[in-house]
């Protein structure tokens, strides 16, 4: 049996495929149908369809943090190097899903509530870099 994180990732990956093929066909129902799940099962992992899409941006921060932990000399990086690593890591990750980011970033992140997970994560990471 898959653990919660694996199920959540599977839901996200399926949603990403559906959204990338045709954003107008993207819905919790479509994701659930594709995975042979009940909609309620999808909602136990994500409160809304936009939350599924925002998960991509959360995963980007998780990958960034993982990379910083793996860099043994990261604590010795200058401010410029740390900020550069933050920016370039995200550019690289965004480039991997360029079409998705181009379609979703404006609505899901930029125009979203200023307290969304992406913006909070960005603020946390910049604060860590500055301190």
Q: What are the residue ranges of the model-derived segments?
A:
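Short, hydrophobic secondary-structure boundary micro-motifs
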Residues: 27, 102-104
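Helix-turn-helix
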Residues: 10, 18-55
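N-terminal positioning helix adjacent to the helix-turn-helix/winged-helix DNA-binding module
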Residues: 3-14
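Amphipathic alpha-helical packing segments from all-alpha helical-bundle domains
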Residues: 113-131
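Amphipathic, well-ordered alpha-helical segments in soluble domains
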Residues: 60-64, 93-100, 125-129
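Alpha-helical DNA-contacting segments of helix-turn-helix folds
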Residues: 52-63, 68, 104
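Hydrophobic alpha-helical connector segments
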Residues: 55, 70-100, 110, 120-121
């Amino acid at each position: 049996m898959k653990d919660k994180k694996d199920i959540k990732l599977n839901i996200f990956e399926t949603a990403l495929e559906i959204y990338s093929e045709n954003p107008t066909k993207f819905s919790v129902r479509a994701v659930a149908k594709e995975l042979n799940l009940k909609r309620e099962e999808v909602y136990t992992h994500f409160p809304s369809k936009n939350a599924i899409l925002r998960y991509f941006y959360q995963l980007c921060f998780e990958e960034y943090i993982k990379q910083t932990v793996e860099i043994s000399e990261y604590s010795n990086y200058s401010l410029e190097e740390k900020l550069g690593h933050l920016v370039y890591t995200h550019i690289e990750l965004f480039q991997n899903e360029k079409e998705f980011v181009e379609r979703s970033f404006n609505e899901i992140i930029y125009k979203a509530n200023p307290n969304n997970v992406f913006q909070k994560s960005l603020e946390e990471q910049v604060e860590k870099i500055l301190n």
